[in-house]
């Protein structure tokens, strides 16, 4: 830290052992570290959902797919990419399969999930809002109603202002400007 900078927060997964905090997962463990990571937008959407499921039912294993709006690293027109030809394809008109660090980063904010999550990403031609499709095997035998009730309870209690539930059949455009980290569709 130089030139008067007292703290640094970066919104990307740390590639080293930099402390990582996500609201709705482990932010209460922040102890004043000068340099911290807030993980990624996908991790911020995944972590509160995974925490509720793990705390209430226990997660044995999980697979997440983020359906992610295109990013500034994608070209508007097809172009060459050094490592992955698909990442060079136009972000504005293609579904682009790629990787995500969120499945790995989740273990930094929810250590109980270390080695239990895997993931992938699909970048899609929308300018804003992303979605996480999370499939888990739980330690408990549950019904859809049990899971819905757990999210509803969390959204009104421990995760109020962080996680919400959607009972209005909204689509991506309806979430532009959404302040919650995650909104769980109650109809699926």
Where are these regions (language model features)?
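N-terminal Rossmann-like NAD(P) cofactor-binding subdomain of oxidoreductases
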Residues: 1-88
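C-terminal substrate-binding/catalytic lobe of Rossmann-fold NAD(P)-dependent oxidoreductases
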Residues: 58-61, 66-188
């Amino acid at each position: 830290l130089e030139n008067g900078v007292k703290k640094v927060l970066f919104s990307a997964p740390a590639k080293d052992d930099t402390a990582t905090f996500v609201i709705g997962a482990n932010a209460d463990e922040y102890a004043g570290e000068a340099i911290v990571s807030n993980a990624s937008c996908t991790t911020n959407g995944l972590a509160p959902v995974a925490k509720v499921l793990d705390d209430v039912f226990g997660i044995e294993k999980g697979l997440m797919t983020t359906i992610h709006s295109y990013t500034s690293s994608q070209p508007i027109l097809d172009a060459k990419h050094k490592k992955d030809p698909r990442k060079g394809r136009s972000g504005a008109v293609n579904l682009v399969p790629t990787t995500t660090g969120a499945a790995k980063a989740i273990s930094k904010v929810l250590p109980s999930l270390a080695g239990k999550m895997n993931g992938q990403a699909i970048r899609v031609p929308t300018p804003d809002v992303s979605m996480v499709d999370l499939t888990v095997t739980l330690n408990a035998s549950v019904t859809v109603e049990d899971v819905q009730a757990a999210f509803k309870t969390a959204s009104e209690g421990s995760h109020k202002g962080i996680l919400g539930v959607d009972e209005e059949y909204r689509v991506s455009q309806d979430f532009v400007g959404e302040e919650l980290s995650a909104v769980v569709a109650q109809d699926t």
